[in-house]
């Protein structure tokens, strides 16, 4: 018990000593602050100097604010520029790439065509084929010209029906002239017989002429057919 009482009394004594030391320090600091306030001179400023100091402080604060905000403003402008111009640049690059591919394709086509032309010029069969084609075209033109001439000549010549009709008209005129030249006489048997004979002869001559003209026309048609067949055969042989 005695030991416990001693320890409790010791602790109380230490706590009281601590409080007393803290109070002494606070008193010393307070007295020191009062002494410093008494030693400081009192500042007295004019209105003009106060305005100048206020303006300078505002300018300094605005300058500091501007300097602090410059990086953010610069980044904003950079981002805006990128946002506006990057899509355009991407489209231009795509177009350039597509045009480059097209140019490459065209260049390959040109290379292939020049190579094929060189090979064609080296091969002689193509030149032979072209010469044969030219010859066949010339012969076909000649045949067309010949046929056109034959067609024109056939149109210039009178047709068979017109020939027969004209010959019939001529014979009829001759017959009428013969009838008008005959003098009227008494009907006798001899005169009747002679008239009949003349009429029969005229009719026979007329028929013979018509037959001759028809034979000539048939011969001309046969000749034209033979010439056409020969021309067609020659053309087929040359083409083959």
Swiss-Prot record:
Cellular localization per UniProt: Lysosome membrane
Coiled-coil regions listed: 211-239
Chief location bin: membrane
Region ranges (Disordered): 1-33, 163-240
Protein family per UniProt: Belongs to the BORCS8 family.
Cysteine disulfide links: none
Domain of life: Eukaryota
Transmembrane residue ranges: none
Known function: May participate in the coupling of lysosomes to microtubule plus-end-directed kinesin motor.
Protein name: BLOC-1-related complex subunit 8 homolog
Source species of the chain: Dictyostelium discoideum
Compositional bias annotation for Low complexity: 7-26, 163-179, 196-205
Keywords: Coiled coil, Lysosome, Membrane
């Amino acid at each position: 018990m005695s030991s416990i009482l001693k320890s409790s009394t010791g602790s109380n004594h230490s706590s009281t000593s601590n409080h007393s030391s803290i109070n002494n320090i606070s008193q010393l600091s307070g007295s020191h602050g009062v002494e410093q306030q008494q030693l400081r001179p009192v500042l007295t400023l004019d209105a003009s100097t106060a305005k100048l100091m206020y303006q300078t402080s505002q300018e300094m604060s605005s300058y500091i604010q501007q300097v602090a905000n410059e990086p953010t403003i610069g980044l904003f402008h950079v981002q805006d520029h990128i946002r506006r111009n990057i899509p355009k640049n991407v489209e231009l690059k795509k177009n350039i790439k597509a045009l480059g591919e097209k140019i490459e394709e065209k260049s390959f086509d040109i290379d292939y065509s020049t190579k094929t032309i060189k090979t064609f010029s080296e091969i002689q069969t193509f030149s032979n084929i072209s010469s044969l084609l030219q010859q066949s075209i010339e012969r076909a033109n000649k045949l067309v010209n010949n046929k056109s001439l034959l067609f024109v000549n056939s149109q210039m010549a009178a047709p068979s029906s017109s020939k027969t009709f004209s010959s019939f008209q001529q014979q009829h005129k001759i017959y009428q002239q013969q009838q008008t030249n005959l003098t009227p006489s008494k009907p006798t048997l001899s005169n009747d017989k002679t008239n009949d004979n003349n009429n029969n002869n005229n009719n026979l001559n007329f028929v013979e002429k018509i037959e001759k003209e028809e034979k000539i026309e048939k011969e001309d048609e046969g000749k034209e057919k033979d010439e056409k067949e020969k021309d067609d055969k020659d053309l087929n042989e040359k083409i083959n």
